[in-house]
């Protein structure tokens, strides 16, 4: 497990439309999946929920997900040189970042989620995500360093945006909870 980092945290979701509020970035696709909304099963709106899930459908992927502002590959799919510094590099053939587990803590309560997208508003903030930077590079809007899904926000009772703490955890250390009902392996 890594040390907790404190940051402004905002809510985003699969299928979120592009608006001024999110710098005109739509979330029908993710950094790794051009068909994220289809593979997820639909729009994961924070409205009309049934428990931790959207009321209209059961997701095909984990509804507890986050975005962090680093991608190990560039836009052409080539491994970035700095990605070789990611803890665990070379230990397996899978992605270094996608599906990785994150613990988010808010007012003494923890929630666990899988890393499913890159952001908020950046893909090259290695020092924030894996290094010793105390805050993210993001200078836009609230200067958030973490985006969380509606299920994650709901579990933690975060209504819009707030300050949370986060850290990476190994899958074997993730406790049972609603975040383990559907685990994303793609």
Give residue ranges: language-model regions:
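Secreted/periplasmic proteins
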Residues: 1-186
């Amino acid at each position: 497990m890594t040390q907790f980092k404190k940051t402004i945290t905002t809510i985003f979701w699969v299928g979120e439309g592009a608006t001024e509020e999110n710098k005109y970035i739509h979330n029908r696709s993710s950094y790794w999946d051009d068909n994220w909304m289809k593979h997820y099963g639909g729009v994961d709106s924070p409205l009309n929920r049934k428990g931790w899930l959207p009321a209209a459908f059961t997701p095909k992927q984990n509804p507890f997900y986050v975005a962090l502002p680093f991608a190990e590959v560039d836009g052409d799919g080539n491994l970035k040189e700095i990605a070789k510094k990611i803890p665990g590099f070379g230990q397996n053939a899978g992605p270094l970042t996608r599906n990785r587990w994150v613990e988010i803590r808010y007012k003494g309560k923890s929630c666990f989620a899988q890393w499913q997208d890159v952001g908020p508003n950046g893909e090259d903030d290695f020092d924030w995500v894996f290094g010793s930077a105390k805050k993210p590079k993001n200078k836009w809007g609230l200067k958030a360093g973490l985006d969380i899904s509606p299920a994650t926000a709901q579990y933690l009772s975060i209504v819009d945006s707030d300050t949370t703490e986060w850290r990476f955890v190994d899958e074997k250390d993730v406790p049972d909870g609603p975040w383990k009902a559907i685990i994303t392996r793609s």
